[in-house]
């Protein structure tokens, strides 16, 4: 049975009824599912796996950091190339769930195969890298690309789930449910053998698939009028023309620039925090898992809190508050000499991470006209994913060039993200004047 998404025509009886309607709950469970992938693969076990395969001392740990950074950057590069087309596909076909399903299944299969090849005893090397390791890195790039591609369609789907007043709460609920997925994902950790992080890949793929099923089966999109078919490359031409309309959409583009730099700091930190905590601050694997759980609880609390802050103060101020919190968290992490200070930084980063998705998704919906929403979400992803190339490339290059300095190289790399956060905050402050003019 599929349920039509038409909450706008219903009178909700309080927030409980809003959150636990089957369409919205099914939508939120996909956040639950993809967060399992994000936390288990992107943040924890893939970095652990590379450190196990490459890192043997402080110098080689920096090389492992470079591999992690560059793999993330390559996945983001492909997303940059395709995300503008995805936005145009949404506007012209009106179909989102179809592509979410296809992209999710590809990501699930690649994640499963990471587990197969991660434990395979292959001999020989490919481009100077052990064959099994090279295959796992390639599969990670593909899995991450399709995971992020599905989110372009998923985020756009939110605009059909409620009224303008309800969207901040729906967004916050989705993010909070998503981070509960982290807790479920990490439940596999006690069953992973020491030094065998690849054992986490197959269970993660299964969990990702299982918790995606509610969206696949119980959520039906509202019918949308399809636009006339255009040549394949016309999508890029339309994106180019949209950039030329910058004067007409100054608020949108200014926010995308701000998001570019803030997301740079966030995306890079997500990919590197596990190795940084272990090699620089001295956390054990189990110690970092506990830290990540605390950070996740902070994300859940922050996403709910900032849903209400966004509703009461407006999304621009809410995003600004999140940016300041992120800046402070990065500063503490760079200069932390003890685990205690890194616990503080991790908790603050958790709040800012969950809250950034809540506030930014709501803000872009508020700023964009209905007929351009899919296209602007594509550009929104474009801005974020270009930054997801630059941040990891910068981080990985710093650790590569200065690897002889040991852990100081990682502190320098993380310190570069402070500059990005400051620039992003600067553009957010500029938006106050633009809002008054508009």
Q: What are these language model-derived features?
A:
Residues 41-65, 271-288:
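Short amphipathic helix-loop junctions that connect adjacent transmembrane helices
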Residues 81-95, 301-314, 399:
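Helix-to-loop junctions at the C-terminal end of transmembrane segments
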Residues 98-113, 317-332:
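Structural signature of the two symmetry-related core transmembrane helices
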Residues 110-111, 117, 123-150, 341-355:
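Hydrophobic core of transmembrane alpha-helices in multi-pass small-molecule transporters
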Residues 115-118, 207-218, 415-438:
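Multi-pass alpha-helical transporter architecture, strongest
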Residues 168-190, 383-392:
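Glycine-rich segments within core transmembrane alpha-helices of 12-TM secondary carriers
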Residues 190-206, 397-421:
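A membrane-interface helix-boundary motif in multi-pass transporters
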């Amino acid at each position: 049975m599929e349920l039509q998404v038409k909450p706008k025509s219903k009178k909700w009886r309080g927030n409980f009824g809003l959150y636990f309607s089957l369409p919205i709950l099914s939508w939120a469970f996909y956040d639950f599912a993809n967060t399992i992938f994000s936390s288990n693969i992107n943040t924890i076990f893939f970095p652990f796996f590379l450190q196990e395969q490459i890192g043997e001392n402080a110098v080689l740990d920096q090389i492992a950091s470079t591999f992690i950074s560059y793999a993330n950057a390559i996945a983001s590069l492909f997303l940059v190339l395709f995300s503008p087309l995805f936005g145009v596909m949404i506007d012209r076909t009106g179909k989102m769930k179809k592509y979410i399903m296809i992209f999710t299944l590809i990501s699930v299969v690649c994640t499963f195969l990471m587990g197969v090849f991660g434990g395979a005893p292959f001999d020989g090397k490919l481009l100077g890298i052990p064959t099994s390791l090279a295959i796992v890195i390639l599969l990670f790039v593909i899995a991450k690309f399709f995971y992020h591609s599905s989110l372009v369609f998923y985020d756009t789907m939110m605009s059909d789930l409620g009224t303008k007043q309800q969207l901040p709460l729906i967004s916050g609920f989705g993010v909070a449910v998503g981070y509960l997925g982290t807790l479920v994902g990490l439940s596999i950790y006690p069953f992973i053998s020491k030094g065998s992080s690849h054992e986490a890949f197959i269970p993660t793929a299964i969990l990702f698939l299982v918790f995606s099923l509610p969206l696949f089966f119980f959520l039906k999109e509202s019918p949308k009028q399809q636009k006339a078919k255009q040549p394949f490359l016309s999508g890029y031409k339309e994106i180019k023309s949209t950039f030329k309309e910058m004067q007409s959409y100054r608020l949108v583009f200014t926010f995308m620039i701000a998001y570019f730099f803030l997301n740079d700091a966030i995306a890079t930190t997500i990919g590197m925090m596990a190795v940084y905590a272990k090699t620089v601050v001295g956390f054990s694997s189990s110690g970092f898992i506990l830290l990540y759980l605390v950070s996740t609880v902070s994300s859940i609390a922050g996403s709910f809190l900032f849903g209400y802050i966004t509703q009461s103060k407006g999304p621009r101020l809410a995003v600004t508050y999140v940016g300041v919190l992120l800046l402070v968290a990065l500063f503490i992490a760079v200069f932390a000499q003890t685990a205690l200070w890194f616990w503080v930084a991790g908790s603050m980063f958790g709040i800012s991470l969950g809250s950034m998705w809540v506030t930014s998704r709501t803000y872009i919906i508020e700023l964009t006209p209905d007929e351009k929403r899919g296209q602007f979400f594509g550009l929104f992803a474009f801005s974020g994913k270009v930054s997801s190339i630059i941040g990891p490339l910068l981080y990985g290059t710093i650790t590569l060039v200065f690897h002889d300095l040991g852990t100081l190289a990682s502190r320098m790399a993380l310190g570069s993200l402070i500059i990005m956060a400051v620039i992003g905050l600067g553009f957010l402050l500029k938006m106050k004047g633009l809002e008054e003019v508009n």
